[in-house]
Amino acid sequence: MLESFPKPFTAVVLGSSRGIGLALVGALLEHSRVERVVACARSPESSNELQSLKERFDGRLQLSIVDLTEPPTIAAVAGGLQSAGIRPGLVLNVAGLLHHGESVTPEKRLEDLDLESLQRVFAVNALGPALCLRHFLPLMSREGKAVFAALSARVGSIGDNRLGGWYAYRSSKAALNQLLRTASIEARRRFANVIVAALHPGTTDTALSAPFQSNVPEDKLFTPEFVAERLLHVIDDLDSDHSGGFFAWDGQPISW
């Protein structure tokens, strides 16, 4: 796996303190092609799991503070890599927001729409990733294959929307998809080796999906570790013809 990437390369994971992001950090560190992993989170020092990985893979794991709602933190990490002469071969934006206590919950009807909640969900799911594209895409490796991928969601597909509801989450992921698609077009002109893609991880047993798992069949609820490995397989299979695409965890394309 990851044999399509030049060896060695640096990977950046944004949103790495738990769930799929944490599993991706662990999976990447197990691969010999990966020289360095930059794990970004709002409070990486408070993640026992990241600290354990840091002890185990000392020298190969860099922990950095990034809050997608705080643009200077995104610029600081990208600037630090640039100053060190490091060009990432893989950038993964995994952070996402569906619910947060009682202040942010998925809407079931129009009357549930709230400006503050909408702004918060869009800030994490679309605006933050847009700034990650701004700062990281020009920084990425020019040697061989490089990939910028972000976790979207099937519910962000306009063509696949048959149930309605979840206004903020659906529309913010649709916005993310458009941002990635648009960035892929610019990348073809400016950074021809960089592939840009949206990925759907499937329903994963994480804090994000926990309140909504009751009706999910057991064989459709995946562990973060399974999803991380599957996503890396999908990423490994991507080529320039796939740039600007939207793909599920099993590699199948998803309609916009």
Predicted features, each with a name:
Residues 17-27:
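N-terminal Rossmann NAD(P)H-binding glycine-rich loop of SDR-like oxidoreductase domains
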Residues 198, 206, 210-256:
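C-terminal helical subdomain
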Residues 11-17:
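Conserved N-terminal Rossmann-fold NAD(P)-binding element of oxidoreductases
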Residues 29-49:
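Conserved glycine-rich Rossmann-like NAD(P)H-binding loop of the short-chain dehydrogenase/reductase
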Residues 67-86:
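Conserved Rossmann-fold cofactor-binding substructure of NAD(P)-dependent oxidoreductases
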Residues 97-127, 141-190:
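Catalytic loop of short-chain dehydrogenase/reductase
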Residues 54-72:
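Rossmann-fold cofactor-recognition segment
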Residues 58-62, 80-95, 99:
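A glycine-rich helix->loop->beta "capping" turn
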